[in-house]
């Protein structure tokens, strides 16, 4: 099965745009209850990276000034870990190693445009069903 067949579509996934402020990111992440969220390039919807609430917290602490930190662009935040993405044409069977180390896998097309996510649960459920056949 291709990754795109199992993916949660982009319209059902909350995301940030690279021109958001830290305050914007906190508001959006608290509203959707995400601990990590995809960041896209505005206008092109290209996937850039994923930002965690821990990354944001470390940024605020390192700034030492909450008001100033909330106005910073999210692009100024250092990320603790890289979240690997995959091409929408990849076979789900090939994603086990990525899925066990990430809560989700961002899905992109050949141009890097965000096409949704594969959750760890959806990949593991699919692979588990295949092993029972």
Identify what each model region corresponds to:
Residues 1-13, 70-82:
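Bateman (tandem CBS) regulatory domains
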Residues 7-8, 30, 61, 78-79, ...:
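Alpha-helix boundary recognition
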Residues 15-34, 39-42, 84-102, 108-111, ...:
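The conserved cystathionine-beta-synthase
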Residues 34, 38, 46-64, 101, ...:
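Short beta->alpha transition motifs characteristic of CBS
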Residues 58-62, 76-86:
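Regulatory sensory and allosteric helical modules in signal-transduction proteins
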Residues 63-71:
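Short, charge-rich, low-complexity interaction segments located
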């Amino acid at each position: 099965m291709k990754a795109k067949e199992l993916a949660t579509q982009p319209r059902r996934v909350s995301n940030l745009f690279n021109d958001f402020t830290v305050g914007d990111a906190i508001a959006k992440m608290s509203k959707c209850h995400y601990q990590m969220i995809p960041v896209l390039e505005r206008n092109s919807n290209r996937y850039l990276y994923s930002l965690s609430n821990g990354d944001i917290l470390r940024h605020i602490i390192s700034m030492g000034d909450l008001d100033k930190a909330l106005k910073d662009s999210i692009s100024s935040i250092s990320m603790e870990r890289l979240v690997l993405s995959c091409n929408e044409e990849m076979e789900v069977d090939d994603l086990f190693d990525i899925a066990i180390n990430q809560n989700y896998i961002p899905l992109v097309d050949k141009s890097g445009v965000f096409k949704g996510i594969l959750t760890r649960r959806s990949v593991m459920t699919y692979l588990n069903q295949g092993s029972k056949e």
